[in-house]
Amino acid sequence: MQRREALKSLAILTGGAVLIPSCNFEKEDILAAYSNLQITSSLQTLLGEIANAIIPPAQLKGAADLAVQDFILVMVNDCLDKDQQTQFTKGLQEFNAFSKKTGGVNFSKLEPSVKEKVITEGLAIAADTADENLKSVREFLATTKRFTI
């Protein structure tokens, strides 16, 4: 009878040993999940700062505390079509230039009230603007706001 228990325990232990390596959730693996977007860790950090400006930390947790940027990237990677993904990525890459033009410095160095102003101005860009970069920033901010909220 003890032989059966030993074999059963050995089978469970072996199964667990086989499964454990596949349960690795390091940051590098998370970035690989966004293969359609080609997002770098610095762009992911910028997206987190933008989401945190939309939902700032107060008595409740802010967007950065909840890792909303990962949710946004998964939704964009999995739910939007290729053109929308390209528009989102282009807007994310152009956002710091827009922030420098509007607020004077990179977005991460701005005060929270100025960050809010930059986002508001980005969302207020006319849909029929001739500048493709501004149009990309507007679409990026609208998508980010929608998935953040």
Locations of the language-model features?
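Mature-region segments of soluble proteins
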Residues: 45, 49, 53, 67-149
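Long, well-ordered alpha/beta core segments of mature domains
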Residues: 37, 53-68
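N-terminal export signals
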Residues: 5-24, 111
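Charge-dense, low-complexity intrinsically disordered segments
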Residues: 37, 41, 62, 82, ...
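Short alpha-helical hairpin
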Residues: 23-28, 63-70
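C-terminal segment of N-terminal export signals and the immediately downstream linker at the start
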Residues: 1, 5, 20-53
